[in-house]
């Protein structure tokens, strides 16, 4: 994953003249990706998390209160007078948590049920939270098609997630595992296609990299890093169990950034998409970095105590 995203961005920029015009297909391709990623979820995990809500509330606080305000404030501090860049920075963090956070949480002994539940609840709420957050933080400065964004999120994220969960619920574990493994390679290829098409839409910005572009990249990296760190700190402050902290780190730090890029390209001027696409470059790299830090500072001490 850390190599897949930058490779797709580079291909999108280099092949922009061939990929431009295919933006219409992206929401449907992304709906397939969401369906494939949701096959591991079911309604029981959601019910369990709702009966023990504190870890989920902490994750949603990081995702939709702390990080949007932090990104919005950072944008106004660093890019004052540039509402499109500020909106892009904000959009990159108001979108729901990423499905791939489940992979990272499982890899580092996180609470898989909690991670799934955070993904599901955040996904279901996203058609309301994303437009509302952007309207409150950037609505006065940038024209937005709020209803269009809500419909886009419902088609790309909510309906495919529900269908994936329904398939899991109504099928045997063996059949679900078979379908999930069969769709996995196609899902990765589709993700590459989505990233490449979205990157092609902002190719001119990547082809003329200057100090301003570098400043946006550094800011995006710092904001993304803060999401992981804030989730870790809040988990420790609230004295959560180790597996819950791992889940909080990856759900709080990762975003469904490809969905954010689709929204940026579809509903905003291309400049808004620049911070979002840059965020795609850093997300998996930062996940790997925090996985290493977890092994060093969180998981090893627990193993030594045992």
Swiss-Prot record:
This is Uncharacterized protein YbaS. Pfam families: SBF. The chain crosses the membrane at residues 13-33, 53-73, 86-106, 112-132, 147-167, 177-197, 214-234, 246-268, 272-294. GO terms for cellular component: plasma membrane. It is a multi-pass membrane protein. The keyword Transmembrane applies. Keywords: Cell membrane, Membrane, Transmembrane, Transmembrane helix. It comes from the Bacteria. Its main location: membrane. InterPro entries: BilAc:Na_symport/Acr3 (IPR002657), Bilac:Na_transpt (IPR004710), Na+/solute_symporter_sf (IPR038770). It is found in: Cell membrane. The keyword rRNA processing does not apply.
